[in-house]
C-alpha cells in the first residue's frame, strides 16, 4: 500500500451566544482551510455555541438538533462545494429527553457518512456534561472518506483507548 499525505485543517473559533453567527464564522474558517489546501477539516467540539456545560440550565437543550439535520445539511453543501471532508461536533437531540455530544462526518461530495457519539462523559466542577449528554451507544467508529479512513474521538474519550 502506497503512503499518501492528507492535509488536515482545524477550525478553532471564539464563539458567541449567537448560533447563526457561530455557523457563519465556522463556514468562513472551513473556506480558509480549504483555500490553504486542507482536504479534511475538523471543527471544534460543540462549535455552534458557547461551551454551555459549565452550568446546568434546561434552556441549553434548545441548542440540540437532529443528526442528520440542519447543520449537517449546511455543512454537507459546503463540503460538496469545496470538495473537503468535514468532521463536526454537534449537540444531538436523538429523542425527547435523549441527547448526545455527537460528531458527524461529511464526505467531500457532501454525503453524510455517519456519526460517533461521545462515550465517556465527564462530570466535574465546570464540566456538567452528564446533565446534558447520554453516553454514546454506537461504539468506536471508523469512516471511509474520499481522502482517508478517519476514526473519531471526542475530548475525554481520548483517555480511554
Give, region by region, the residue ranges found by the protein language model.
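Hydrophobic positions in the central parallel beta-sheet of the AAA+
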Residues: 9-11, 41, 151-153
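Short, glycine/acidic-enriched loop or turn micro-motifs at the edges of active sites
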Residues: 15, 48, 160
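Cys-nucleophile CN-hydrolase/nitrilase-fold catalytic domain and related Cys-dependent amidase chemistry
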Residues: 19, 28-108, 115
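Residue-level recognition of beta-strand->loop/alpha-helix junctions
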Residues: 12-14, 44, 117
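Short, basic, glycine/proline-bearing loop/turn elements
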Residues: 11-17, 57-63, 147-150
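Active-site catalytic loop in hydrolytic enzyme cores
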Residues: 65, 77, 94-161
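Short beta-strand segments enriched in small/hydrophobic residues
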Residues: 2-14
